[in-house]
């Protein structure tokens, strides 16, 4: 069975829009920590402009296991747990029913790569390692292109599986 992993920030949720509202005088690391711990940024995020189109499409895929694969952006357990809880709250508030998987940093998403797994992510720092580890990575720029590439990738995986039987 094919597993489709959807990234949250930059694919479903508009992290940058909210992050840019925060104190630009703090260093990036302190600014991010403050955004998570004090501002609970991950609970405040809007949908990406075309997230509904992508979510609607994937919800109609038959025989595909759909999950969330998102980074907490830190190795700090306290900050990581805060990010995880906020992201879970966001998914619940937005009625996104998929199982959520969390990694500490981008490159760890490659641990989920298999020949029958697909990652949709807006960061090449996630897609390239995922692909190198044997999975199928789709660099998300907009829903229309991602949907086209996703459908082709699913056909490709299914064709390879049929040939190997």
PLM feature segments, named:
Residues 46-47, 51-84, 91:
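Substrate-recognition element of Asp-dependent hydrolases with the DxDx(T/V) motif
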Residues 34-43, 138-139, 143-158:
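A short, conserved beta-to-alpha structural element at the edge of catalytic cores
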Residues 1-43, 142:
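Active-site neighborhood of HAD-like aspartate-dependent phosphohydrolases
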């Amino acid at each position: 069975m094919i597993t489709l992993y959807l990234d949250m920030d930059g694919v479903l949720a508009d992290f940058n829009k909210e992050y840019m509202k925060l104190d630009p005088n703090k260093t990036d690391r302190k600014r991010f920590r403050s955004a998570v711990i004090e501002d609970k940024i991950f609970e405040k995020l809007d949908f990406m402009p075309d997230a509904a189109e992508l979510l609607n499409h994937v919800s109609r895929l038959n025989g595909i296991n759909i999950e969330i694969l998102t980074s907490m952006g830190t190795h700090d357990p306290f900050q990581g747990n805060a990010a995880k809880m906020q992201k879970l709250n966001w998914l619940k508030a937005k009625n996104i029913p998929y199982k959520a998987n969390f990694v500490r940093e981008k490159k760890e998403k490659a641990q989920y790569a298999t020949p029958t797994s697909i990652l949709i992510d807006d960061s090449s720092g996630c897609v390239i390692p995922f692909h190198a580890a044997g999975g199928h990575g789709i660099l998300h720029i907009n829903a229309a292109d991602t949907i086209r590439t996703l459908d082709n990738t699913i056909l490709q995986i299914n064709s390879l599986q049929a040939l190997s039987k």
